[in-house]
């Protein structure tokens, strides 16, 4: 053996051909700081081998390299800008040395080669991939851009257009797609990968393949005429502005960096990449997006730990068809758990099956499935008007009308029709689980399972623990939600649970602004364009349904009278009384018309202004800053209360529930990350400025305590060691 590090080793394969094998402890290879340093040590050894004729890079794992070690990012990005720049310069010098070896190099790619793994691949002369390989640069999804030469080598290898598409969108592509654009030289069966790699290297050694000619374009300026460059970069910038917008600077920075480096050789282009990377890495957007990635891993890890000894349900049932029931049935069947769908109404059953069929047909149209798969999934959804087959159900979810009397009657009846060990869950959005459990003989087998609409798109499922819910019940439901491809987050019981409990104070802030003379159109614009919500509050209420919100608002007011009981008639009341229920009947805050695809399109409707005038003071101007503060303080305060009361277990789970359940802008990272970014002391000052507006604006005790020493909610991340102490030599 020529060299053995902790995460890779170097060996002779055959006469003159060495292999560099990535083999980190654990299940996957990551390109962390230690591996970059170890790669440098391996190159020290290789550069001294006078009889070296070629180098093969491969992985001992099921994937080549899954990317950088993202757990290092938060601390690495905390180091001073100059030190981070120095470390990047060191890392790039390692990849340059790999690229500059005086012999042909080839990378044998199996599984994932993402981020730094892809950048390692790009430094070699030839690339072979197995059919399951996926190669790409997802950095912009984390608020950064490639930092190990990806923005330099990929455009020179593929051409500007293909490279810009991959880098700006943070895409990874299949082996076949990589072959088509020239990212790999061939796709070979896994069992033939090493054999094919050695054959290609021998051809390069013998001069049949010109490896030096393959390498040269990566060292030179991008081969683009002035007209081609103008077209490529203008189109790319336009697309990025349309898709990413101003809140996500990484994609635009990457495009502009590639454009600025187009006329430069490798080393000058890498210096530009370094210069662009460092400010992105130290931005609040990167901190938030990396935080979301880490929180997502944490939440998924909790679910995995919780269900370690739990068998995934083999048969499910849904009570109540229609859009929601049909969506749940589709998702369960699509992910491989057969489902019985019961309703008392034939029409509703037809609607439920129709909803599932519609979603499957969309998959068929997109080429994701064939007719056989479609028929197979539909065959596992069994519509019924009675309880036939319910004795087989491991888990049943009730999705009937949001009325406690109806739900209690249905739940009590269902309990008599299922096995004693069957878990029953309610898809209620606001009614306390312990209240619904009061009619059950086996309340320990009952919990809440709150899906979000549309079920097939929304990743979150709130799993609600009632007073008597057992751990086994929670584990069973979490297991089913995970099997359905959802992110389950366990919360404790209260009116509205977590997501709706924190959403309605946000709506209350909106109602108060309207009462005080604000224009709902301006509020929507500010909350969408400035704060970054996918929908402003007026538009969101129209989508949720004014009637639904009116009912839920009453439930929340009864549950939290001190804060959520209002003493005035608000905009939601006015629209509800006027029969303006939102998208469902074509008029709410806005009017709705069907577009060419049959989807509701928002259009202005001046008639609403006279209705709102009845419950509002005369119109007056509000600054964008005041609108954001008055909208967000009630929500953030309630989020903090939920943590303090143990409704939600951690800031990470709270932030993921907000991002996945409500569409909280990812570049803010969630309520706790947003609060930490401002600083708890500054946030408290803002809240106190508005506390005259009522109890929703009064900061909770725990927050006031944190603000007294400006403490964050997330653990303080210490900067990584200075670069001189990082493993750079």
From Swiss-Prot:
Record key words, sorted: Fatty acid metabolism, Isomerase, Lipid degradation, Lipid metabolism, Lyase, Multifunctional enzyme, NAD, Oxidoreductase
Active-site residue list: 450
Chain intervals for the UniProt region annotation (3-hydroxyacyl-CoA dehydrogenase): 311-729
InterPro entries hit by this protein: 3-OHacyl-CoA_DH_CS (IPR006180), 3-OHacyl-CoA_DH_NAD-bd (IPR006176), 3HC_DH_C (IPR006108), 6-PGluconate_DH-like_C_sf (IPR008927), ClpP/crotonase-like_dom_sf (IPR029045), Enoyl-CoA_hydra/iso (IPR001753), FA_oxidation_alpha_subunit (IPR050136), FadB (IPR012799)
Keyword Oxidoreductase recorded: yes
Record text on subunit structure and interactions: Heterotetramer of two alpha chains (FadB) and two beta chains (FadA).
Name of the protein in question: Fatty acid oxidation complex subunit alpha
